């Protein structure tokens, strides 16, 4: 259940919220980004509520099995909420405050997913390849700049791994200022939006793996806690047990 809820959360976040550029190349807020931006926190709150409620339901059933049909509500609640707050909650906060934590998964699994989506081709489509020629529409640069740009064009993986949703606008401005990207037009702007959406995929895949690790730790911690708990029988349950013992 945790896997599918987490997968659905990130899929919907991408499709409805995160794939839209919040700021365009000119530094102006985009219409789509402005409309969808406020939905992100709502998705996150709804996700955490669903995760805790689903785990609580399962854990209450587990206590019922362990304690002979006597549900341990308070024990199940503490064993569910505390690990989620201390583990999954802390991971969420750290990924927001320290985005660099996402790099190990973003630069591996995230890069693989973005590469399947064609991020290298999109980046190369944006690249100005006419550095050495002179004439209308072409760029003349120093030889060392040309060599650097050619190297990046042949193997853009390092450049791709340095792009994040947080620094995308700054990256875009830098590429345009040094003339690495082609001048802005309708076709270029469309590819920039596509590049951003693929960078977001790379980032979300990284977050997904972090959540899965945290979720695994939460579930194992909760399970161990419930397996070793002391059952607290209700007054009604004690009366039933006493009646059975008298009959015997």
For each predicted feature, which ranges?
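Juxtamembrane inter-helical linkers in multi-pass membrane proteins
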Residues: 116, 236-247
